[in-house]
Amino acid sequence: MNFLRQFGFRFTTGHGIWAATLIPACIAICMHFDLLWLGITLGALIALFSVLTIRGLRITGWVRAIFSWRRRHRSTPDIASEPAVGSTVMPGDHVAVRWQGDYLIAVIELVPRPFTPTVIVNGSAMTDDVVNTKLVERLLEAHCPDLEADVVSAGYRVGKTAPASLIALYEQVVGPYPAPANRRTWIVLRADPEKTQRSAHRRDSGVSGLARYLVASATRIADQLASNGVDARCCRSFDDYEKATEISYERETWSSIKGRSTFTAAYTAPGGPDMWWSARADHTITRVRVRPGAAPSSAILLTTLANPTTPRGFSCLFGGQRAALQGIVPVSDKHYDLPIGSAGVLVGETADRYPVYMPFDNVDVSINLGDARLFTQFVIRSAAAGAVVTLGPQFREFATMINGRVGRTPRIGWPNATTYLGPHQGVGRVILRPNFIDTPRHRQLPIQLINPREESRYQMALEQ
């Protein structure tokens, strides 16, 4: 069944005209040599190959992809221009724009709601902190139909700061499910100077008008997303976006991108975010391109330390690896509800034994842990999820086991927040007990603990 999904049909006027011209010519030439059967066969093949696609490309497309890849595979991609801020009057003067190839772009960050749990039900991640790509398309149609948008998510399933044995243990506990320890999401608005010429000219001439139009559109889209329950903020810097989506690049091969010490491969997969974030990788980037009036397309970039192998259900974008970095994908997809923030740390399971995750990486908080077992579980799972753990001097040996630090203030440092392992002024409080978790957003959310036997040795080290 997966094999048949690689094939499709697409009719375009240009290919139809060529087929209508070549088929009679082939038949006429072959009739002249009394080879009518050959003419009919060639005509049938021309008709078939003018509409048949293999992984989104016709035969002519694959030939073009091969020559394009041979021309560019040893050259590095063009570097984006320096960002410019202050292209229009308030409220859009804090929106950065810059050139990326032939497009002027602006970025909107989607801010996750704090303490939004993720429950894994039969392999699917259930969370209410999502953005629907159909909503993004409707907003583009209503406010800026000549722009296109990329919904970009970047993150990782497990961290890299903990020892390899602890990371392997946490991966075993988490299983092959879509529960990334870290994930951030942006909407990248892209303006083509040719398509937006009329809209941009209403504001000013040249590049200035284009920048003003893009900034005003970004501000309007962010406001409308907020009205629909999605916390969206225009970015005045590309730093966070670049850091999260940066890929090491040395050269492009036919099926991957070779970096300094990593490999990145671009894929398509029809299963949506549940399938995309279940694939094992050191770093994951998903990009869904939305255009008004057209089917969306998606690309998944998986970065690994070893030579990549195609995950089950994925299709590698052969010859189009660099193009996929910019969201250029020949295969169409459908609209999805895309999770915005991290799934977070595994804190327990429901009464029906569905795993429950809670993010701690977007707001400062203090946590009250009921006993040594809860303390051990939360600390080692946070370390495996990529946090930097700081413990008191009395836990020096335990801190060494998880690559932690020793300091006066016990805490867990996330990329954008801190979780204090004790009372702390000025922040909210989370209470974790064997039968519930209490957060500033939830009042005693019922859970049950998950107690893998392999974690017991860490508790023994803590109690020594």
Swiss-Prot record:
Keywords: Cell inner membrane, Cell membrane, Membrane, Transmembrane, Transmembrane helix, Transport. GO terms for cellular component: plasma membrane. DNA conjugation in M.smegmatis is unidirectional with distinct donor and recipient strains; mc(2)155 is a donor strain while MKD8 is a recipient strain. Mutations in a donor strain that alter DNA transfer do not always alter DNA transfer in a recipient strain. Part of the ESX-1 / type VII specialized secretion system (T7SS), which exports several proteins including EsxA and EsxB. Plays a role in DNA conjugation, in at least a donor strain. It comes from the Bacteria. It is found in: Cell inner membrane. Belongs to the EccE family. This is ESX-1 secretion system protein EccE1. NCBIfam families: T7SS_EccE. Disruption phenotype: Increases efficiency of DNA conjugation when disrupted in donor strain. Loss of secretion of EsxA and EsxB, but not their expression. The keyword Cell cycle does not apply. It is a multi-pass membrane protein. Part of the ESX-1 / type VII secretion system (T7SS), which is composed of cytosolic and membrane components. The ESX-1 membrane complex is composed of EccB1, EccCa1, EccCb1, EccD1 and EccE1. The chain crosses the membrane at residues 11-31, 34-54.
